[in-house]
Design a protein with these regions (language model features):
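Charge-rich, low-complexity N-terminal segments
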Residues: 1-98
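Intrinsically disordered, low-complexity regulatory segments enriched in Ser/Thr/Pro
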Residues: 79-115, 163-167, 171-175, 180
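Long, solvent-exposed, polar/charged low-complexity segments
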Residues: 1-46, 140-205
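A residue-level signal for beta-strand positions that form part of recognition/binding surfaces
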Residues: 72, 131, 165
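A general structural signal for short secondary-structure junctions and capping/turn motifs
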Residues: 64, 91, 124-126, 157-159
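Compact, glycine/acidic-enriched structural inserts
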Residues: 97-153
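Short, hydrophobic/aromatic alpha-helical segments in well-folded domains
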Residues: 76, 86, 120, 192-195, ...
Length: 205
């Protein structure tokens, strides 16, 4: 793998003004890296889950004026799209890299999935290490450490509020040395996904 990690310049993409210019930088700087690690991570998840997984790279196609504040790759068990399915994500905001298992508001059966999680709250608390984060809105940066969140409350909200979301995983600050070491970073992302696989499976039963 030639993947060398993410640089300061990659994160500076989100300071570029204008939709066209920022999108061009995303396509040139970040998306080639997403393609590279995305395929490795997709193959890895397909093998671990024993089902075919598919790589999606955010196109930001619906945007007409405002440039994206973040960008990501997503891995789901559906070839056409990922937003209506539980999916794994790796992406960048201007100040951190995120590694998520994501359940976003477009999921058609999120009540059922939330119910499965609520029945397994203790298991989830045991499975998920203390350095993990939870986000309730994928468009915002303000994720909280799992140790500081009311998990039951978050999952009930995810179940009951149409727009509510549930993302769980890890954050790496943009200045962290780990991001400059492609091999170590890839191992870290894989380890995070592997930790979250039991939750992914839980959402289907």
């Amino acid at each position: 793998v030639n993947f060398t990690g993410f640089t300061e310049k990659d994160f500076e993409t989100f300071t570029i003004d204008g939709l066209e210019d920022r999108m061009e930088a995303i396509r040139e700087r970040i998306q080639p890296k997403f393609k590279e690690i995305g395929q490795i991570l997709t193959d890895d998840l397909s093998a671990s889950l024993q089902k075919e997984m598919f790589l999606h790279i955010a196109k930001h196609a619906r945007r007409t004026i405002n440039p994206p504040k973040d960008t990501w790759l997503a891995i789901a068990d559906n070839k056409r799209g990922y937003k209506q399915h539980p999916h794994f994500q790796v992406g960048l905001f201007d100040d951190h890299l995120f590694v998520w298992l994501a359940y976003i508001y477009e999921l058609p059966n999120k009540e059922e999935m939330a119910g499965n999680f609520l029945e397994n709250l203790n298991t989830i608390s045991k499975l998920v290490p203390d350095d993990y984060y939870v986000s309730l809105d994928h468009t915002k940066k303000d994720a909280k450490p799992i140790t500081e969140i009311d998990l039951k409350g978050a999952l009930e909200r995810f179940r009951d509020v149409k727009k509510a979301e549930f993302l769980i995983g890890r954050h790496i600050p943009a200045n962290d040395e780990l991001l400059r070491d492609g091999e170590k970073l890839l191992a870290y992302i894989r380890e995070t996904f592997h930790t979250l696989i039991p939750l992914y499976k839980m959402s289907y039963h």
